[in-house]
C-alpha cells in the first residue's frame, strides 16, 4: 500500500479491464518516473474521448459522429449484417478485410451469472433494422464461449421468424496451433466445420 494520491492512482488504473494490481502499479510508476511521459496530454485525450466519442445511432459502433464511418460508407453492402458483442470485435473483423457488409454491436452477451439478459443488449434495435427488407443475411459473430454461444442460440431462434439467411462464424483450430493443446470443444468444432480439400 502506498500513501495518498499514489495509491489512488494505482486503484483507479486497476479499475480498468485487464489491468490487475501489479499492472496498475507498474503503469503508475511509469507515469511518475518517466520524464518524457506527458500526463497533461493523456488527461486531455481522456477528457476529449469521453466528450466526443459516442455510439453509432445505427449499429452501436464507436463514432465521433451520429453514425459511424462504416454505416455511412456507400461501398458497404446493406444486405449483410454481422452481429458482434463489442465495438472492439468490429475492429478485429475489419482487420481481416474480408467483410464488406454492415455491423450491429450488441453491447455485450447474454450472461445470467452477471445479470445480463436479452433486454440489456441492443437486440430490439437489431430487429428494427431487419424490418427493412434490404437485409438478406445475418452473420452471428459472438465469442465462442458460453455467453457468446447462449447469445448466438437466442439470436438464431429469434431470427428464424425472418426470411433471411442466418449464419455463424466457423470456429476451430487456430492457424499455427498444435492439436495436442486444443480443447475437446474446439477440436469437435473443427471436425464439424471441416470442408473438402480444394474448396
Curated annotation (Swiss-Prot):
Kindly state which keywords UniProt assigns to this record, in alphabetical order: DNA damage, DNA recombination, DNA repair, Metal-binding, Zinc, Zinc-finger
Disulphides: none
The biological process GO terms on file are:
DNA recombination; DNA repair
Name all Toprim domain ranges. 79-174
**One short Pfam family name for this protein?**
RecR_C
Hey, what's the signal peptide range on this chain? none
For this protein, the record's CDD domains field holds: TOPRIM_recR (cd01025)
Single GO MF descriptor: DNA binding
**Family listed:** Belongs to the RecR family.
Q: Output this protein's name.
A: Recombination protein RecR
Q: Record the organism.
A: Clavibacter michiganensis subsp. michiganensis (strain NCPPB 382)
